[in-house]
Amino acid sequence: LNRAEIYSKAGADAILIHSKEKTPSEIFTFAKAFKKSRNYIPLVSVPSTYSKVYEKDLIKNGFKIIIYANHMMRASYPAMLDVAKSILINKRSFNAEKKISSIKEIINLIK
């Protein structure tokens, strides 16, 4: 809390609070104390470990920004592993075609 207050006084645009806990109680306690200290800069949450919390509860507790930091990367790994296994098992990529984007889709994406 002290560090957040110092950052706020120094002109920080937001305060990102992270926690290794499995529940959001620690960050909710911080948010309540931060609000009492009359700091009005936005609070940012990164709910990686406390993933059961709903956005509405983060918002209700004073968080203005929610960052899902690495979920897309973590989701891509099982998909890549599945395609790699298919190619190794079948000795060709044809069997994995239904699981992947077409070349046309990728080209359109990067245009």
Where are these regions (language model features)?
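Alpha/beta enzyme core
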Residues: 1-68, 74-85
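Extended, intrinsically disordered, low-complexity segments
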Residues: 71-111
